[in-house]
Amino acid sequence: MIVFYRPDRDCVIRANRLARAWPCVVVDNTECVATSEQLGLDPQITYLANGANLGIATALNQGINCLKEAGCTCALLFDQDSEPSSQLLAELPAVLSVERVRNDRVALIGPAYEDLRLGGVAPFVRFGYLKLKRVQPTGQQPVEVDFLITSGSCLNLATWAAIGPMDESLFIDFVDLEWCVRARSKGYVVLGVPALRLSHELGGEPVQVFGRRYPGHSPVRHYYLFRNAVALIRRGYVPLSWKSTELVKMPIRLAIYGLFMRPRLAHLRMSLLGIWHGFIGRAGAL
């Protein structure tokens, strides 16, 4: 399935390509409703137009439930800007099938993602106190990780009811991390597949600070990032290791967004508002 938000022609082309490989659902969070024919989508695609931005979590839940009702056993999840290769489309569900035989508690698997703007292939991640542990994507065997980004991941639908849906109160940021953390807290497994790659752009245009490139976002996205980080820090099932790392990173992020991203005041204001709303329990759309 793919989540649309104000898609361009390339997004439609990517969706049509996916539909040639697997049953495909497109959930569109664009404010203006269009038909699948107007967009140029393949007739085989199930198209759900929300007519409003209901958030990534709601859109994912809609698409995943649609695939489950259609009798699918797994769900490949993509952002509209992701470029999955034919190899990934064929092999990721096959890897999940093999891993399910070995362990029926495998909930999610995913490739290493590659963003050339941020320096190439990103490592997989395990939580550590004060600092994330980075696992380089090498070798052929899947490796256990603490979370995966949504795009490019393949979800075992047999685990969906037990783990539960994506948390719609988060709206957008940390939705993937929260679901993985919840799955692992219930004894399920998340696996990275180092042999597979996904071309994916994380965030907007990066900003370079002291030689390191950070993904750029709008001030509103930074609101959600800080609000949801605080919200997750307050939840008991979220590991202390992740909380400690996030508390270290939060002031650094705040400084980067407030000093190096324009308009500086808007980024700083929305980030601080997010922190405040996280403390008072504000959830959902801004």
Per-region residue spans from a language model:
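Short, well-formed alpha-helical segments that are part of the catalytic scaffolds
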Residues: 1-20
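A conserved acidic beta->alpha catalytic loop
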Residues: 27-37, 52, 82-83
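Glycine-rich, basic loop-to-helix element that forms the pyrophosphate-binding segment
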Residues: 50-67
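Short beta-strand-to-loop acidic/aromatic patch adjacent to the donor-nucleotide binding site
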Residues: 72-83
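Conserved donor NDP-sugar-binding/catalytic core segment of glycosyltransferases
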Residues: 87-123
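Short, flexible, basic/aromatic active-site loop/helix in glycosyltransferases
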Residues: 125-146
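A short, conserved alpha-helix in the catalytic core of glycosyltransferases
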Residues: 153, 159-164, 169-196
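Non-catalytic, C-terminal membrane-associated alpha-helical segments of glycosyltransferases
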Residues: 235-286
